[in-house]
Curated annotation (Swiss-Prot):
GO process terms (BP): translation
Short name of any one Pfam family annotated for the protein: Ribosomal_L34
Any GO CC annotation of this UniProt entry: ribosome
Record GO terms (molecular function): structural constituent of ribosome
Alphabetical keyword list: Ribonucleoprotein, Ribosomal protein
Family named by the database record: Belongs to the bacterial ribosomal protein bL34 family.
Name this protein carries in UniProt: Large ribosomal subunit protein bL34
Keyword Nuclease: no
Native source organism of the sequence: Mycolicibacterium smegmatis (strain ATCC 700084 / mc(2)155) (Mycobacterium smegmatis)
Gene: rpmH
Length: 47
């Protein structure tokens, strides 16, 4: 029985484009996410 391939293939550019700060600031909901993380005192706001 062969297992499937590993699903996490790290790629920094994709990580930034999908979860990055610029993307979060683009939408109202994204800005809310950053604001919540700021108020919570998260060390890293975005990827």
């Amino acid at each position: 029985m062969a297992k499937g391939k590993r699903t996490f293939q790290p790629n920094n550019r994709r990580r930034a484009r999908v979860h990055g700060f610029r993307l979060r600031m683009r939408t109202r909901a994204g800005r809310a996410i950053v604001a919540n993380r700021r108020s919570k005192g998260r060390r890293a706001l975005t990827a």
